[in-house]
Each structure stands twice: as C-alpha cells, then as structure tokens.
A protein has these predicted regions:
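Short beta-strand His + acidic residue motifs that chelate non-heme Fe in jelly-roll/DSBH
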Residues: 60-63, 80-82, 104, 110-116
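Short glycine/proline-enriched turns and hinge-like loops at secondary-structure junctions
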Residues: 45-46, 64-65, 90, 115-117
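A short, N-terminal "cap"/entry segment at the start of jelly-roll beta-barrel domains
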Residues: 1-46, 94
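Double-stranded beta-helix
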Residues: 2-10, 85-88, 109-136
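Conserved short histidine dyad/triad with adjacent acidic residue
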Residues: 33-37, 48-65, 106
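Short acidic-glycine-tyrosine-enriched beta hairpin
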Residues: 85-106
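Short, conserved beta-strand element in jelly-roll/cupin
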Residues: 51-55, 65-80, 84, 125-127
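Conserved hydrophobic/aromatic beta-strand scaffold that supports enzyme active sites
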Residues: 31-33, 49-53, 70, 93, ...
C-alpha cells in the first residue's frame, strides 16, 4: 500500500500541450501526480491518479490521448468541451461543478476552462498510458 497526502506531491505548472502536431497554450494549470503504477511495456505507467488545480479563467485546450480518463470535480466550476474527432468542431459544452464525474474515452478530443472566481480542482484517473509525450 502506498499512502501520500496530495500536498506532499510536487506541483508542476503545465504551459503547453501537443495536439495534432502543434503546441497549444495551457493557461493557469498545475498538476500533482498522486500515483503512477504499472508498465505498459514501453516504460510508461498503465495507471495514474492526478490532482489538477486550474486558476480562474485558466484552461486546458483541445487535446486527445490514448488513455481513458475519469475526472472528478472537487471545487469550482468548469465548462467542459467535447470536439468532433474528425473536424475538431465543438459538439458539446457542459458546465460541471463539485461532485460531477466526467468520463473521456480514448482519443476523444476534449478540453475545459475554469469559469469560477476561485481556483478549481479535480482529480483525474487515467488508464493505459502509452506515450509519455501525450500525458498531461
């Protein structure tokens, strides 16, 4: 068993994120890895649990990845976006607050923005991470 308090995990600021071969700005976002376990055969974790903090107005732009993820909103309010995988057009926009769980399947383009006046937080559980470059 591995036990750790989230404040004891190193907080890393995220500035850029790749999508379709281009780097996109990530605004006001930091991440703490709470756990990383397993090996997908390429030296990367198969499972991870992360803690995100996004400042007011901060956002994670459109992106996708091989792994599945489930986010659980702890505080603040987010506008969550789903995009068409072929055209990148916005197909769904949902406001999510504390207690909301959001599942993103593998390779589904998505993003989010903190629309509250306070730092917003969520946990993000990921499975089957295949490419370190694609993990936020």
């Amino acid at each position: 068993m591995h036990v750790i308090h989230w404040k004891d995990c190193e907080e890393k600021k995220v500035d850029k994120f790749p999508y379709r071969g281009k780097m996109h700005d990530v605004i006001g976002t930091s991440i703490r890895w709470l756990s990383q376990h397993g090996d997908d055969g390429n030296g990367y974790p198969e499972y991870g649990l992360r803690f995100f903090t996004i400042q007011p107005g901060g956002q994670i732009p459109i992106h996708n990845h091989f792994y599945h993820q489930t986010m659980f909103i702890i505080s603040g309010e987010f506008e969550c976006w789903e995009f068409d995988p072929e055209t990148d057009e916005l197909v769904k926009k949902v406001v999510c607050g504390p207690g909301t769980s959001i599942y993103i399947p593998s390779m589904q383009p998505h993003g989010m923005k903190n629309i509250s006046d306070e730092p917003a937080t969520f946990t993000c559980c990921i499975a089957n991470v295949y490419d370190k470059e694609d993990t936020l």
